[in-house]
From Swiss-Prot:
Residues 971-991 are annotated as: Disordered. Belongs to the PIGG/PIGN/PIGO family. PIGO subfamily. It is an enzyme of class 2 (transferase). Forms the ethanolamine phosphate transferase 3 complex composed by PIGO and PIGF. PIGF is required to stabilize PIGO. It comes from the Eukaryota. It comes from Mus musculus. Coiled coil: none annotated. Its main location: endoplasmic reticulum. The lineage of its organism: Eukaryota, Metazoa, Chordata, Craniata, Vertebrata. Keywords: Endoplasmic reticulum, Glycoprotein, GPI-anchor biosynthesis, Membrane, Transferase, Transmembrane, Transmembrane helix. This is GPI ethanolamine phosphate transferase 3, catalytic subunit.
């Protein structure tokens, strides 16, 4: 089997999984139709005259305006409790001291001194709680969909009707300053704008200070009708430090001064709106739907009396989208066409000078009626354009609205029993509006069951292919190359057929369906052909070759994907499953008798065969490996982030950056520990390379390990020092610190890239020495005429070269007898593959560590230690000298996958959007990336899926390590002085003198080597594919579950992206092994050619 065939076959299998994931995703992730219809003053939302109070008003549009100006202060991530008044201390209870409590004192003073002028609300936010989706909701009044969360940093212009567009249509002057996301959402919509980059979450002050530079001059200038200021410091402080850091108190105090300054400058016709777009978790993150994330603050204030009654003791809870119709009607604008929010009715009370006895209540009902008309029109238009809305519920709501609207018109003609009638109308309109919103929330989950079923079936078929092909890969005489040509031909045929039908019918070619058709068309013929060929060549093997204990553990893990409760505790369940598998591995060694004490060796009689070799590992050695692995797994579990659903859990404080620490001494101690972890990791790898002799090679990769990697450690340590103390630097040095913070990470990443290039260029780390031969003249090479011209010739001569190369490789150069022949000795061939793999993993680990917070370097150290111990434990029970094909056991692959998952959680990640480490996008780019989105996405993705990448690239070590751990056979007994054995070597002792072949044993059977790599890749893809299949089935079966968008959908997305990263890493890792193998073949060929001269 050729190397190219192995890579192509694995790439084809990956394509099958990709096609299944894409097809399932296109049918599962909800979307909704965005209507481009617009409201206008000339077209009322429903039949009938202008509402009450609009007659005789100049420029009346649906309702007369109450305010001519609005100042909207949007404080990003202003959680409700940040603005909640601090309660007085109750005697007998411990005082509460939290940095964010009571810092917005101006709000509390207004609520106490002017209760009719200001009001604080708890704004209930619709998930996802990402900034771009919240801005869309705050301007359109529509509900976001789950798929919108992926567009948070790829904002596009809003095409739906919105408040900004209505302001422009009415000729109002809109001035904006702050978050530059608004520029992408509303291009050219502002009469004046001051945009500031919003993506650098480590920068707490640039945006806010830039706003303050223009806010008060613009406010006093008067050339505006709506002024919008979007502050980002609170949100960035939460991302960088969390809400409990003293910096949060400073930032909130700054916002309080801003609010107080605005209140002092407002005129009577101006409304002040202070709002948070979303909240934040206890860690300062957002994006999910936890109570802290969906609870934002909303404060309204006017110099004139705004509310007819005093505020309640507990602030009222209102949907965030209610602000859109409220602002539109208060400003005399049409409500945006797609709004689903409900007006805040108490803001529409009639004045005390009105002639109507119930003017206040009637004005509120009129606002609700207009709002209900607008929502009813939207539902009618939307249901006509798509079939998303439930017909039965839609009909019930339309009946409710028709009755309430008729009763309202009748009341205007005959206002009898006004108080009871108005109360009934208010309740009916509110019931309709809330029911309509609930209908939209429930119905905007557009599932295509056909695509979901097709995607799941394609994933299941790909898993079956991996299971079947992994058995066929090591079958004698089985050829994959001709078998692969059939599915490729069928896939191309079905692709051309589908494209031709689409073009003929005039329908648009769907790339997702095209890929699925190609995948299915290529997969089914292969399964049929493989099954027939398999059955004809040998008896049927069991369909489930996975050992029963491993199968049980795998089924338990897959079953947990169907429970939201297990998702919550997966970070703790994964180490338990890993520990159970380690216990099974140790128990298996015990069952095989490898944990028993070795029997005493007996001397054989003269002339008998030599004694057998001792076991490769003692029982105590394997037992200590298992205990050490469990201990390191437990230590890695100390680094954990608690999910939102476990409020009693406390996340590890070690996952926060050193910059968030207050104590200087503790920060210095932790910094020393982090640098120590870097040094220890480098030392461990260098000691390992030195043990196997690869560190003595003069090749460029080894020289880079000696000199380049210490520079990488130094650069990383220097960057951490600057990042942890950048805010404490003197002002005159801050520019230098900022420049160094950009240069150092790029230098480390550049060095890592250089090391990988050198490794690919010269991957063979072998030391060759030439010297005078000893007195022994025994010839070690079988006579061979001419250079090797085929792979078979090379496979024949290579083992002979290596078995005696360290003793005497006799050249045929022309030398005098006095000088003697020249001997060439080569070292480190036994670990040539593993040395390249370990070096590559270390080169990848340093940039990935740089993308994490400093203390996660301890997790990376534990990662390498866990991997080394697991590899040694697996090697203890894997025979390498037995005849037959090479293979990697299922329990080894399962343990490797579990270790990758455990490291994912230990590095502070969770399969939820709110736990994504956005700060990684600014490592090396403190000033942001401009308009580029692919580079920050790459950095954040590398941070999130670092464990998937490292373990996938290192997967071939599962095959290589047992050969690396092959030990030397028994040494030759010392001859008696003066005996004949001093001058002659017996054949028995000659066999005992042989060095272990170790990884060169793989060179004895290159076809078996390539087949083993293929089988390893298929087994790894099977386990990963089984996990993504389980997530897809869970999401489809539980698509109407309460937690589908909170738990199952994010888990599916993370598993899907993790599978893609792992599959790419697996291909790269196997390709690197093959590159080393090609280089080793070329190296041997050069030696043979030199021998011929």
């Amino acid at each position: 089997m050729r190397k190219v065939s192995v890579l192509l076959f694995l790439a084809w299998v990956c394509f099958l999984f990709y096609a299944g994931i894409a097809l399932f995703t296109s049918g599962f992730l909800l979307t909704r139709l965005e209507l481009t219809n617009q409201s206008s003053c000339q077209e009322l939302p429903g039949p009938g005259p202008l509402p009450w109070g609009s007659h005789g008003k100049p420029g009346a549009c649906w309702m007369p305006s109450r305010f001519s100006r609005v100042v909207l202060v949007l404080i990003d991530a202003l959680r409700f409790d940040f603005a909640q008044p601090q309660r007085s201390h109750v005697p007998g209870e411990p005082p509460v001291s939290v940095p964010f409590l009571g810092k917005l004192g101006s709000l509390q003073r207004i609520l106490e001194s002017q209760p009719h002028h200001g009001r604080l609300y708890r704004s209930q936010v619709d998930p996802p709680t990402t900034t771009m989706q919240r801005l869309k909701a705050l301007t359109t009044g529509s509900l976001p969909t789950f798929i919108d969360a992926g567009s948070n940093f790829a904002s596009h212009a809003i095409v739906e009707d919105n408040v900004i567009q209505q302001l422009n249509s009415a000729g109002r002057r809109v001035v904006f300053m702050g978050d530059d996301t608004w520029r992408d959402l509303f291009p050219g919509a502002f009469s004046q704008a001051f945009f500031f980059s919003s993506f650098n979450v480590r920068d707490l002050h640039t945006v806010d200070n830039g706003i303050l530079e223009h806010l008060y001059p613009t406010l006093d200038g008067g050339s505006w009708d709506v002024l919008i200021a979007h502050f980002l410091g609170v949100d960035h402080c939460g991302h960088k430090h969390g809400p409990h850091h003293p910096e949060m108190a400073k930032k909130l105090s700054q916002m309080d001064q801003v609010i107080q300054g605005l209140i002092e400058r407002l005129e009577n016709d101006t409304l002040l709106v202070v709002a948070g777009d979303h909240g934040m978790t206890m860690n300062g993150d957002h994006g999910g739907d936890s109570e802290l994330e969906v609870s934002a603050a909303l404060f309204l204030y006017s110099p004139t009396a705004l509310f007819p009654s005093v505020p309640p003791e507990e602030p009222e809870v209102i949907p965030q989208v209610s602000l859109v119709p409220t602002l539109a009607l208060l400003l005399g604008l049409p409500i945006p066409f797609g709004n689903t929010g409900e007006v805040m009715a108490e803001l529409f009370s009639g004045g005390s000078d009105s002639s109507h006895p119930h003017s206040s209540a009637l004005a509120q009902v009129s606002a609700l009626h207009i709002n209900a008309q607008q929502v009813s029109r939207f539902l009618h238009t939307y249901s006509a354009a798509t079939q998303d809305l439930q017909v039965k519920e839609l009909h019930r709501l339309q009946t409710l609205f028709s009755k309430a609207s008729a009763r309202y018109q009748h009341f205007l003609r005959d206002p009898q029993e006004a108080e009871a009638a108005l109360s009934t109308l208010t309740a009916e309109f509110q019931q309709f509006l809330r029911g309509a919103r609930a209908l939209c929330i429930e119905s905007w989950a557009r599932f295509s069951l056909v695509r979901m079923a097709g995607g799941a079936a394609l994933l299941a078929a790909a898993c079956l292919l991996c299971l079947l092909a992994s058995q066929l890969a090591v079958a004698p005489g089985f050829l994959f190359r001709p078998l692969l040509l059939i599915p490729v031909a069928w896939g191309l045929t079905w692709t051309i057929l589908y494209a031709g039908v689409s073009v003929t019918t005039g329908s648009k070619i769907d790339l997702v369906v095209l890929g699925a058709v190609a995948a299915a068309g290529s997969l089914l013929p292969f399964l049929w052909k493989a099954w027939v060929s398999r059955g004809s060549k040998r008896p049927l093997a069991p369909l489930l070759p996975v050992p029963r204990p491993v199968l049980i553990l795998l089924l338990i893990r897959l079953a947990t994907f169907f429970s939201d409760s297990f998702f919550v505790v997966e970070a703790r369940a994964t180490p338990f499953l890993l520990g159970s598998l380690v216990f099974f591995l140790v128990a298996q060694l015990h069952w095989e008798g490898q944990l028993l004490p070795p029997k005493p060796l007996t001397m054989s009689r003269l002339g008998s065969s030599a004694p057998t070799a001792p076991p490769r590992h003692s029982g105590a050695h394997a037992l200590w490996l298992g205990i050490g692995l469990l201990l390191f797994t437990r230590l890695a579990g100390l680094f954990h982030r608690c999910p939102e659903e476990t409020p009693a859990c406390r996340s590890s404080p070690w996952l926060s950056p050193l910059a968030s620490m207050v104590g200087g001494r503790a920060k210095n101690l932790w910094y020393g520990a982090c640098v120590g972890a870097l040094v220890a990791l480098l030392v461990v790898v260098r000691l390992w390379l030195r043990r196997y002799g690869n560190l003595k090679s003069p090749e460029p990769p080894v020289l880079f390990v000696r000199w380049g990697m210490p520079l990488m450690v130094l650069g990383t340590a220097a960057y951490w020092a600057l990042a942890s103390g950048a805010e404490e630097a003197p002002p005159r040095l801050r520019a230098l610190v900022a420049g160094a913070s950009a240069v150092l990470p790029r230098a480390v990443m550049g060095l890592a890239a250089l090391g990988l290039v050198l490794l690919l260029w010269r991957p063979v780390t072998v030391l060759v020495k030439a010297g005078a031969a000893t007195s022994r003249t025994r010839t070690i090479l079988t006579p061979f005429s001419g250079p090797p011209t085929s792979q078979a010739d090379l496979d024949y001569v290579v083992p002979q070269i290596y078995r005696h190369m360290q003793e005497e490789f006799q050249g045929r150069l022309e030398r005098t007898k006095a000088q003697g022949p020249i001997t060439v000795a080569a070292y480190q061939l036994g670990s040539v593959y593993s040395a390249a793999m370990v070096t590559a993993l270390l080169l990848l680990a340093f940039p990935l560590m740089l993308l994490h917070v400093e203390r996660v370097s301890l997790v990376f150290l534990l990662l390498f230690l866990q991997s080394f111990l697991l590899l040694h434990l697996l090697a203890a029970g894997t025979p390498v000298a037995t005849p037959g094909p090479f293979t990697v056991l299922w329990q080894a692959v399962s343990a490797w996958v579990l270790l990758a998952t455990q490291t994912f959680y230990s590095t502070g990640h969770q399969p939820v959007f709110s736990a994504i480490h956005w700060h990684a996008a600014f490592v090396g780019f403190p000033d942001g990336h401009g308009s580029s989105t692919w580079l920050p996405a790459l950095l954040v993705g590398a941070n999130t899926f670092a464990s998937h990448l490292l373990f996938a690239v290192g997967c071939p070590l599962l095959l290589l390590w047992p050969f690396l751990c092959e030990r030397q056979g028994p040494k030759r007994r010392q001859p008696l002085p003066g005996s004949e054995s001093e001058a002659r070597v017996r054949p028995e002792e000659e066999e005992e003198l042989q060095e272990p072949l170790m990884e060169v044993r793989l060179r004895d059977a290159p076809n078996h080597f390539n087949a083993a790599l293929l089988q390893l890749g298929l087994k790894y893809l099977f386990i990963l594919g089984a996990q993504i299949l389980a997530c897809a089935l869970a999401a489809s079966i539980l698509r109407r579950h309460l937690m589908v968008w909170k738990v199952f959908a994010p888990k599916f997305i993370f598993e899907a992206v993790g599978f893609i990263v792992s599959s790419v890493g697996l291909l790269l890792g196997i390709a690197l092994v093959m590159r080393v193998d090609v280089a080793v073949s070329s190296w041997f060929k050069k030696l043979v050619l030199a021998q011929q001269r």
